[in-house]
Amino acid sequence: MSRRLALLGALLMGAAIGLPAQAIRGKVVEAGTGRPVSGAIVEVRGADGYLTKRVVTSATGGFLVPLSTGGRYRLTMRAIGFRPGTREAVDVELAVRTLPDLSLERQLFTLPDVVKFAGGSCVNAGTDRTAFAELLTAFGGALTVVEQAVAHGEITFETQVIERTVRGVTARQRRANPARTLDTIADTLHRPITNWPVHSLSVDSLKRLGFAVERWEDGQGSWTLYGPDPTVLFSPWFLETHCFSMDRPTPSADSLILRFAPRRRSQVGDIAGELVVNATDLAPRQLRFRFAYLPAALAGVTPGGIGGVLDFDREPGGIWYVNRWRVWSPTLSGRQRVGGTELEGRVVSARPDR
């Protein structure tokens, strides 16, 4: 019985939103200077606390949030390198409500300040847990800004995605050409990226199933491996079940590495990895992940041979995005590796949506 192993890199298409009569208009600026903060995430929640809309500020720091109904709303603003800000009790009637400028304070870190918190969330030695938790929150906020800017921003990122499949040749093919051991098939697609490029499951599903899920169809089993997204990486469940630590590559380096790994051995699929960020503002540079554990049914597969890398960049207008990514996994027949799949993508152009 054949089992296929594939790492999903699904990219979902977004839908355009119309402009109703009610809306909130505003501008996010840097406190003290008044400079516009582009690429900030603005979340609007209703009186019940549920998320109503999420938008990204433009190059001028402006935003317009269309609403389906009037009422009282609460705004939260997040941007890389800034402390989150809120605006309470924003009342909207049958009109566009224009707000005064919304200010965000800079949140800068110096290397000595950051490094003294290093040590990890699983050990006590020298770790200021309150400060470490604040840093983890900042890390998670930075990745969330990237994810939401891609999904809800005013920029369309066109990508080139190459899928390579490597598989072993048949015995007849080897007899005809003894030097031939592998076949490589490559497909190239061009499409917009409108979501986090590595597909994940909900936190509730990961709690039950892990990052490796077996599915059956027509008597044939296949395994699907999932990667992390910002919601998963910094969820209470992931923080409780994984160890986190920080280090600096060299004493003079301007970057920090946040490492994470399972707290204990897992009977389901689980991941480890690193997030590389700027030391001063915690802007993300790269996210690397790999499988640390796999289910017993995949005991013949090396977990570290499955994973991915995402590189981040900032476009001239200030929007942060995933610039390049690569994910890879083996292909199995039974419990033997017979090949592999690699998905490699990169942004080739960016244009305003309107």
Identify the residue ranges that each predicted region occupies.
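Conserved "repeat-terminator" motif of extracellular CCP/Sushi domains
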Residues: 91-94, 100-110, 114-118
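Structured extracytoplasmic
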Residues: 115-272, 293-297, 331-354
